[in-house]
């Protein structure tokens, strides 16, 4: 009886009477009878915003399959493809049709009927209430009426008048665009991003803007994500890695325009110390031209080299400060013979292709110069003060984790198939305990106040998660950037 009373008291917080409870039970049982909503698992976005957004809007072919199912014997292939294109990119397709259609009102009427049919088809897995929530605010009533039309003759005129009014009021373009967006939202019920929004692609910032507006999304962080999270938290090694990677892929629009990172200090520093250096081996790979912030190849190469040296110094300092990382083999600046221009790795000597290191003291190669310290302070401030970057990273924290119950990163294992023990900050952990602890430390790195105990160690750990051999996010033995 006591247990029943406790349950009843809990129910009473949300349901004032028995009828309210019965209503919810009926509702939940009915939902369980519906098919499971479509879940979309996608990984390794790597900043390729256009490809990713197209994949989500098209639901990886699900929408095209619905069109084939509905209109395969009714419309020609060209019309079916045009309808699909309208859903994927409504503004562009409408603009194209305006150049070729003699009477747009006829086109509008036809495609609205067709889009309603497609929308009705993709919404069959959901309750009417859930569908209504996915419809645009100002058109939800109209679309709801059209979606739940019947074949009664006395209602046909009513539905036809709705569409005629949309066209005559001059809002057909926006109505069609919103209807197309609704189809895309209904085609994918839940989106799982399994690692690496960021990397070499031109606009991870556009991907994040898109995902923030998406109705239901979660993240499993990848190592490219965590290095950005570490950079936003102010870790110098993470900042240097992020800048080096994106400069090397010519992503200046994203850095300076997208996130407002001030690269002027780095440009000035690079010209001062590498102004006579061709930096041949640091020239960027140009996959996408910058529209708003073009940077010359030589300037970019000098910036790339300047920040790469800062990266190697910052990483060396952290490796020496954290012997528990077991990354001593990545201490390479002290293995360089600066007089002869060679480096010793694993007992072998190699000649360096680039031998100009004006900011490295051979006697203390991991020490920053005063100019480098000033540069890195200014770059760190720019990352920490970027409103858009911090908003995106907070979204990654609020909607993401190191793992989820139905997927995981690279779990450290022994050769015998057992969970491998990993020592972090004096704690020896494995399996789920390791994941939970790392997840806790990543959150502490970002949200712990500056200069608080454990803040620096936690942010340093984010760098280790980017490239450490036992990192669940990396999954390899080593990162060979210098080589």
Predicted feature locations:
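Feature recognizes metal-dependent phosphohydrolase scaffolds
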Residues: 1-483
């Amino acid at each position: 009886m006591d247990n029943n009373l406790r349950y009843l008291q809990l129910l009473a917080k949300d349901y004032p009477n028995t009828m309210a409870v019965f209503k919810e039970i009926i509702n939940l049982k009915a939902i369980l009878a519906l098919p499971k909503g479509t879940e979309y698992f996608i990984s390794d976005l790597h900043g390729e915003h256009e490809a990713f957004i197209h994949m989500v809007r098209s639901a990886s072919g699900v929408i095209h399959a619905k069109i084939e199912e509905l209109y395969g014997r009714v419309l020609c292939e060209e019309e079916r493809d045009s309808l699909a294109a309208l859903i994927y990119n409504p503004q562009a397709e409408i603009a194209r049709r305006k150049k070729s259609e003699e009477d747009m009102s006829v086109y509008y009427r036809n495609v609205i009927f067709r889009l309603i049919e497609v929308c009705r088809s993709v919404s069959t897995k959901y309750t009417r209430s859930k569908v209504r929530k996915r419809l645009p605010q100002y058109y939800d009533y109209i679309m709801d009426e059209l979606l739940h039309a019947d074949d009664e003759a006395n209602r046909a005129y009513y539905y036809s008048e709705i569409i005629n009014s949309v066209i005559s009021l001059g809002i057909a373009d926006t109505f069609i665009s919103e209807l197309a967006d609704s189809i895309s939202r209904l085609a994918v019920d839940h989106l799982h991003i399994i690692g690496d929004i960021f990397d070499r692609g031109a606009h991870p910032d556009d991907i994040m803007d898109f995902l923030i507006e998406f109705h239901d999304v979660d993240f499993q962080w990848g190592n490219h994500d965590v290095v950005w999270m570490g950079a936003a938290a102010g870790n110098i090694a993470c900042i240097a890695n992020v800048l080096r990677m994106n400069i090397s892929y010519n992503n200046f629009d994203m850095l300076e325009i997208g996130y407002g990172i001030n690269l002027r200090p780095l440009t000035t520093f690079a010209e001062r110390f590498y102004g006579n250096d061709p930096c041949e081996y640091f020239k960027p790979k140009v996959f996408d031209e910058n529209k708003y912030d073009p940077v010359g190849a030589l300037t970019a190469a000098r910036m790339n080299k300047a920040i790469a040296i800062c990266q190697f110094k910052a990483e060396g300092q952290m490796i020496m400060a954290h012997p528990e990382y077991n990354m001593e083999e990545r201490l390479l600046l002290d293995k360089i013979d600066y007089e002869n221009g060679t480096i010793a790795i694993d007992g072998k000597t190699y000649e360096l292709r680039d031998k100009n290191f004006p900011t490295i003291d051979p006697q203390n190669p991991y020490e920053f110069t005063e100019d480098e310290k000033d540069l890195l302070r200014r770059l760190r401030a720019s990352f920490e003060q970027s409103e858009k970057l911090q908003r995106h990273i907070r979204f990654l924290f609020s909607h993401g984790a190191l793992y989820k119950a139905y997927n995981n990163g690279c779990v450290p294992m022994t050769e015998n198939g057992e969970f491998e023990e990993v020592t972090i900050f004096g704690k020896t952990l494995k399996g789920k305990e390791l994941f939970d602890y790392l997840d806790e430390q990543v959150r502490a790195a970002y949200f712990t106040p500056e200069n608080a105990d454990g803040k620096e160690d936690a942010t340093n750990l984010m760098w280790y998660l980017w490239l450490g051999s036992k990192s669940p996010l990396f999954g390899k033995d080593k990162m060979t950037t210098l080589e």
